[in-house]
Amino acid sequence: EICACLVGSEMCIRDSPNFMNIPGENLVGVMSSNEYLTRVNLMDAANPDSDTPVLQGKKVAVIGGGNTAMDSVRTARRLGAERAMIVYRRSEEEMPARLEEVKHAKEEGVEFMTLHNPVEYLGDERGRVKQMRLQKMELGEPDASGRRRPVPVEGAIETIDVDEVIVSVGVSPNPLIPRAFQGLEVSKKGTIVVNEENMRSALPDVYAGGDIVRGGATVILAMGDGRKAAAAMDEALRG
């Protein structure tokens, strides 16, 4: 009889990619980095003869400044984008991406439009994205993350031509998992609260790790959580 289980947000349904909830996000050619990278890497979507070929834009904007954003923009560049841009609302110094990821992206010809934030995507008569409107930003006082808060510069809006936009602004924990386990303690961000020493949740026989606890981190950290939880579960089951 199984008396304990480990919960991770990759169990059945992936984490939900975040969007910015701005006009035009439903246009053809606007997608999450999760969808883009999954289709290219796992579904052979870069092959035009595949069942579900991915759009290979020539003017590609990737929104975000993390490692996944760098993966996305470098992939777009390798798939033939003539102009591949990172659009990030803070400065390069505040980017969460690893320095080597930024360096490699620049070496591949990626443009960095820092201190810019999209406010709207514009489409053509076929419903395909053709432009994005960007709000110029400046840095204010640090926010809760410790990084300086981006503040809009009044009246500073510019329009850029694009034919593909990849949104890479993080993910949110799958909300179905906490609902499936009544009694779990959940944070304001929707992550499961655990004892960090053994990854045990508020339910004594339920352990959790990875993004459902951390809110988005690396595979290495998720593997570490799993090992820690497995050891604790083994000890508990042995009595």
Residue ranges and their predicted role:
Residues 9, 124-157:
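Conserved beta-strand-loop-beta-strand element in the redox core of flavoprotein oxidoreductases
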Residues 26-57, 142-216:
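FAD-site-proximal beta/loop scaffold in flavoenzymes
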